[in-house]
């Protein structure tokens, strides 16, 4: 059984339109996704503005960079603001015990003002 003429023409057309790696335009320059030596996928290079009047753009760029790092599970470039619980945990001593015991031993504001 011989293939039909329209089918042969369609195959010839599709094969002629297919791009080979040699004929595809290559992206020159920086800014694409790449793999580092450990095999991790790295995002595009982020060029931060250096002028003083572009602080807002710089902060936005740093927020985007933090978002990329958060997606990849990497630490943030800006330290996060500590919550009250983190501050209390930082000052809790091991001999005091847990935070519930710590909060019971702290005098209340009204008691201090009365004395």
UniProtKB/Swiss-Prot annotation:
Keywords: Antibiotic, Antimicrobial, Cleavage on pair of basic residues, Hormone, Neuropeptide, Secreted, Signal. The keyword Transferase does not apply. One of its GO terms (molecular function) is hormone activity. Residues 86-115 form a propeptide. Residues 1-23 form the signal peptide. Its main location: secreted. This is Galanin-like peptide. It comes from Macaca nemestrina.
């Amino acid at each position: 059984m011989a293939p039909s003429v329209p089918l042969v023409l369609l195959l010839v057309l599709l094969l002629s339109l297919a791009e080979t790696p040699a004929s595809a335009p290559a992206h020159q320059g920086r800014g694409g996704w790449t793999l580092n030596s450990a095999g991790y996928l790295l995002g595009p290079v982020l060029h931060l503005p250096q002028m003083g009047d572009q602080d807002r753009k710089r902060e936005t760029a740093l927020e985007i960079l933090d978002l990329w790092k958060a997606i990849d599970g990497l630490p943030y470039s800006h330290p996060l603001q500590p919550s009250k619980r983190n501050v209390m945990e930082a000052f809790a001593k091991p001999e005091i015990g847990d935070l519930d015991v710590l909060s019971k031993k702290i005098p209340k504001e009204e008691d201090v003002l009365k004395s």
